[in-house]
């Protein structure tokens, strides 16, 4: 993983974040007008559930999947959505992409995919939360693969 600052006026990184080495973290107090962003790595993926712009991603998650997600590390976003951090145990290559369902996936850089990042809305350093990220079940893997393995869901 790695973390860096986002300029809130432009909603863009303050650095070329793709050039940061893995396990490089922003240290110190986040200045006014900025937010912390975190990019996952390895098999860690982040399911970004949106509740904004007329979309409610929660309405597109089966109850059994949501029941599994609540046991991994997660936090609410400012728009009342959430970021669920998952250790993906499947065999497929998931894509860093958004869908029309209010569900986005952020992955680390892999196989030509630059990866992505999320605004980190938690008050504890991500390094201290890694142990809370749970492995995915076969059922969750299949659901993620249906949404994020290259089928056009935009």
Give the predicted meaning of each segment.
Residues 1-154:
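Conserved phosphate/metal-binding and DNA-contacting active-site motifs used
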């Amino acid at each position: 993983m790695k973390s860096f600052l986002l300029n809130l006026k432009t909603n863009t990184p303050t650095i070329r974040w793709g050039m940061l080495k893995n396990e490089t973290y922003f240290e110190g107090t986040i200045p006014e007008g900025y937010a912390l962003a975190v990019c996952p790595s390895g098999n860690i993926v982040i399911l970004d559930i949106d509740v904004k712009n007329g979309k409610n991603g929660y309405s597109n998650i089966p109850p059994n999947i949501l029941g599994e997600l609540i046991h991994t590390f997660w936090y609410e976003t400012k728009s009342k959505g959430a970021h669920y951090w998952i250790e993906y145990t499947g065999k497929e290559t998931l894509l860093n992409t958004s869908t029309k369902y209010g569900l986005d996936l952020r992955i680390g850089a892999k196989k030509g995919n630059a990866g992505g990042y999320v605004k980190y809305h938690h008050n504890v350093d991500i390094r201290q939360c890694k142990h809370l990220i749970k492995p995915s079940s076969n059922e969750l893997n299949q659901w993620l693969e249906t949404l994020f393995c290259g089928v056009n869901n935009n």
